[in-house]
Amino acid sequence: MDMKISGSGSIPAGEYDAIKISGSGTIQGNIKCSGMHVSGSANAGGTVECAGEIHVSGACDFDKDIITKTLHVSGALNTDGSIIATDLVHLSGGINVDGSLKCGTLEVHGGLNVDEDIETETVSVHGNLVCGGLLNAESIEIDIRDGCLIGSIGGSKVVIRHKKRKFFKNLITISFNDKQVRGIEVQQSIEGDEIDIESVTCPRVSGRTVTVGEGCKIELLQYSESYEIHEKAKVGKIEKI
């Protein structure tokens, strides 16, 4: 059966068809559903499993894991657990994940903060990204205007661009675990086949072909085939592997 809340109400633990919350709703315990749409506010105390799509244009707080096919967020979503999406995660709002995020395709046009690892086939970021662990994908495209902090990156093709703001002289500062970050920082390493980066600070970059663009600060560059370094980039050591 369908469940709909347009005022204020609660949904008991159980299995449902479509769930729609346009008011203020509380989900009590673990639920399974075919689809969920939240345009108001919702709080879920258990694991949420959705066979179809979860769409959030309001505000959601989840205490445990979110398991779904697709997840669209144009509002705000927070979870104390992890997110597993077999297909797509798309956000133009904000998502905060205390655990990890795993999906087929990740599209970020807002702000994403994941305390642990991100694992996906394809990732495209045109907003703000914080990943406390490993960002792992076959294809990684990051286009950052503000602060970005990632533990480490692994992928086949890695492209990182920094688009300067037209009306603001300085980059916005973001915080992660009380650390102030300006620009794009990868704390451990970037490893891939084809790597092309700009304005990145990283201890080690290792790949088959590596292009280090303007504004980069790299301690160790490792390559197996070829490399290029912009005249306004800083590289401490170069090593053929």
PLM regions: where:
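Extended beta-solenoid/beta-helix repeat architectures
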Residues: 1-241
